Regions:
Chain A
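Surface-exposed loop/turn segments flanking beta-strands in extracellular/periplasmic regions
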Residues: 208-218, 271-280, 374-376
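N-terminal periplasmic/intermembrane-space "pro-region" immediately following the signal or transit peptide
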Residues: 22-103, 391, 420-423, 453, ...
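Flexible glycine-rich, low-complexity coil/linker segments exposed to the extracellular/periplasmic environment
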Residues: 225, 245, 265-269, 276-281, ...
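Outer membrane beta-barrel
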Residues: 79-260, 266-267, 297-302, 306-315, ...
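Loop-centered beta-sheet repeat module
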Residues: 269-326
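Bacterial N-terminal signal peptides that target proteins for export
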Residues: 1-8
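Bacterial N-terminal signal peptides
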Residues: 8-17
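Outer-membrane beta-barrel pore domains
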Residues: 103-107, 154, 161-165, 176-179, ...
Length: 527, 193
């Protein structure tokens, strides 16, 4: 019993101790567990905070991206608007043409010619206003100026060289400002095309089907100045509707006008057995008026009135009047008039122009010229300089008492259906083949051939009457209205035994060549 | 000499200025707004019911088929059309169309009769610097009674305006487009509106 009691006591004490020990461990564990749970909770909250931050950052980034996108879109829209407004206000265009020519002349039998490239710009500073410009590069390849200035040989040496190609020209064909004062009255000022005849005001190469301009307007200019002929001035233009009677179109300008102006030519020539020669030739001929100070105290007037009874039909009369002599010569005038027209009957068209120009008192101008210039030429005599001759010479050129002539052109447009599926037709809406025949004649009456003078007195004035005609027949292909491929045969003839070069400005004929056959192949394009 | 020139110069200007203003026309400009357009081609109309026809790809495909060699320079997003009546009687449709001239779109309205032929054409907006003569009634009269079989091309059945060939060609394209639309959408199988 005692042993049992002892065992009981021992077990109780033991169990109590174990229980106490066990109770203490569970509390710790619970505390630890709570601590861990707290930590986990804190970590969770921290993660949530971090996630929230990330979300906020992402949202901010997305917002920022959206903002950037919006800004970019706004910038793009702004740029588009600006370029669209600019495109609305300024339009760039132009035309160009090249030609290959083979002819029967002895000296020059074939050549490519870069006829011209013309850049046009059309701007609207405000709704009723317009600025238009045509800048022409004719026969142009390059123009280069070199100049060096340096001390040399105990002095100063200035050297200048101009490098360019024959016939290169840069010119403003048109440069004007127009103000539509009312819808029916337009005021125009600047370099305007002189409205004499119909070619000068419609001279764009891609509008014509033959790769050479007409004689009266260009090759043997009956116009006071060859086309394109702009002058500085101001005037009015507009269209007048006449109801059932059709439409009148008018242009009327006051301009500086044509004047006899000097062209200075330098000629360096080696000769055998004669002396080598350096010549300065000053040629006075009718030229486009100046854009600086007018050399005559008088303005010219030019006007054209056209009546179009129906679409495709037009007949017009035009007139030019103005002094052509500079202030230092006697006061003489040019009177010129032209009649032109166009008629269309289905695929047939006939277009024509007649121009008549009268230079008044050419002989009086020659006498006046002699008085002012005094001596026609001056040179160093061979007794002073036996091997080298230097000469200065003054000449009158391009004058005739009267010049008149015409061109008439017939056209027939057609398109063979079998070409439609070929490369010539399949890309285009309305391709055309055009058969063309052009006839031209020019009369030069009282053409000044030579004016000799000495000591201020005209000693000889040699004038002659010349005639020239040309027939051209060809075929043109127009895939679209702005582009034309041209092929033509051309026959030109002047008075028997006389040179074509004396009366034309485009045929380098020898002295006995009075006729020329030529094949012209050209391309003209607009945009 | 000088006085004669001055006399001529001073004579020309007032003579031109004295011309009646309403006889003279301009090149660029807005000549009709959308509301005026159907009245311009159907002046006898009393009621104009507007209907906008969306230009879907399917419709364009059908139009291309009927247009043949005529290739529009613009496909409108939608076509503004008007059913025109006079006191209940159906006169036809007016369709507003656009085509590019040389550089910019020309907007015009085409009046189409119930038989599918052109009643009249009128220019609404001309944006080119040249060639505004296409606006003239005497030019637009050439389209009267033309139908889808007509070429509507310069030097074919339309007299050209020198220097405005691209604009003339554009008007022809636009008229064809309007005729095709009428055929496909506006007129019923019996050719009635």
């Amino acid at each position: 019993m005692k042993r049992l009691l002892t065992l009981f006591v021992v077990l109780s004490v033991g169990l109590t101790a174990v229980g106490t020990a066990l109770g203490a461990t569970l509390d710790d564990l619970e505390r630890q567990l709570q601590a861990i749970q707290k930590q986990i909770q804190e970590l969770k909250e921290e993660k949530q905070r971090q996630d929230q931050k990330i979300r906020e950052m992402e949202a901010a980034q997305a917002a920022q991206k959206e903002e950037v996108k919006k800004e970019a879109a706004s910038l793009r829209e702004q740029a588009r608007r600006v370029s669209s407004e600019l495109a609305e206000r300024v339009r760039i265009g132009g035309y160009g043409s090249v030609r290959f020519e083979g002819n029967s002349l002895k000296e020059q039998s074939n050549t490519f010619t870069f006829r011209r490239f013309v850049l046009t710009a059309d701007a609207k500073p405000a709704d009723p206003m317009q600025v238009y410009m045509e800048l022409e590069f004719e026969r142009f390849t390059q123009l280069e100026l070199e100049r060096t200035t340096r001390p040399q040989d105990g002095g100063l040496r200035v050297a200048q060289a101009i490098e360019g190609t024959d016939g290169s020209e840069i010119s403003f064909e048109q440069l004007w400002f127009q103000y539509d004062l009312y819808p029916w009255l337009k005021f125009r000022t600047g370099q305007v095309l002189v409205p004499l005849g119909r070619f000068n005001i419609n001279h764009d190469d891609n509008r014509w089907n033959i790769a050479r301009r007409s004689l009266v307007d260009r090759g043997v200019p009956v116009l006071p100045v060859k086309s394109a002929w702009p002058e500085l001035g101001a005037g009015f233009l507009g269209d007048i509707r006449l109801g059932e009677l059709g439409k009148l179109t008018y242009e009327a300008y006051v301009i500086n006008g044509v004047a006899l102006d000097a062209e200075v030519e330098n000629i360096a020539q080696t000769r055998d057995p004669r002396r080598d020669k350096l010549e300065l030739e000053v040629e006075f001929q009718p030229s486009r008026g100046t854009a600086k100070l007018d050399m005559k105290d008088s303005k010219a007037v030019a006007t054209r009135l056209a009546w179009s009874p129906y679409p495709g039909q037009e007949i017009a009369g035009s007139f030019y009047y103005g002094r052509y002599t500079p202030q230092f010569l006697s006061d003489e005038s040019i009177v010129a008039f032209a009649i032109d027209g166009l008629t269309t009957i289905g695929p047939f068209e006939i277009e024509a122009e007649y121009v008549n120009t009268h230079f008044r008192n050419v002989d009086r101008v020659a006498r006046s010229f002699a008085r002012v210039v005094v001596d026609q030429s001056a040179n160093i005599p061979s007794s002073v300089s036996p091997t080298f001759e230097a000469e200065v010479e003054f000449e009158l050129a391009g004058l005739a008492r009267n010049k008149h002539g015409y061109w008439i052109e017939g056209r027939y447009r057609f398109w063979p259906e079998f070409l439609t599926s070929t490369v010539f037709g399949k890309y285009f809406e309305n391709p055309q083949l055009i058969a063309i025949v052009r006839g031209e004649q020019v009369w030069l009456n009282g053409l000044v051939r030579e004016a000799e003078f000495e000591g201020g007195v005209l000693t000889k004035l040699e004038q002659e009457n010349r005639r020239l005609y040309r027939v051209t027949a060809g075929l043109a292909y127009r895939p679209t209205p702005l582009v034309v491929f041209q092929l033509a045969y051309e026959y030109t003839k002047t008075d028997k035994g006389r040179s074509l070069a004396e009366v034309t400005n485009f045929l380098p004929a020898q002295s006995d060549e009075d006729e020329a056959h030529a094949i012209l192949v050209g391309v003209a394009f607009g945009f | 000499m000088l006085s004669r020139r001055h006399f001529l110069t001073s004579l020309l200007t007032p003579a031109i200025v004295a011309l009646a203003p309403n006889l003279i026309s301009a090149q660029e400009g807005v000549f009709l707004d959308e509301e005026e357009a159907p009245r311009a081609v159907f002046p006898e109309g009393t009621h104009f019911e507007k209907k906008v026809v969306p230009s879907t790809e399917a419709l364009r495909e059908k139009m291309r088929g009927l247009l043949g060699r005529t290739r529009p320079s613009i496909w409108e997003d939608a076509y503004v059309t008007y059913l025109v009546r006079r006191h209940g009687e159906r006169l036809g449709f007016a369709v507003i169309a656009e085509e590019i001239g040389k550089h910019r779109p020309i907007t015009f309205v085409v009046g189409i009769k119930p038989n599918g032929k052109v009643k009249d054409v009128a220019l609404m907006v001309y944006r080119e610097a040249y060639g505004g003569e296409v606006r003239e009634r005497r030019f637009m009269r050439q389209y009267h009674d033309k139908d889808l079989a007509a070429p509507l091309l310069p030097y074919r059945d339309i007299v050209n305006i020198a220097g405005a060939t691209l604009s003339v060609q554009s008007i022809g394209r636009g008229v064809k487009k309007a005729l095709v639309l009428a055929q496909l959408v506006l007129l019923d199988g019996a050719g009635r509106p």
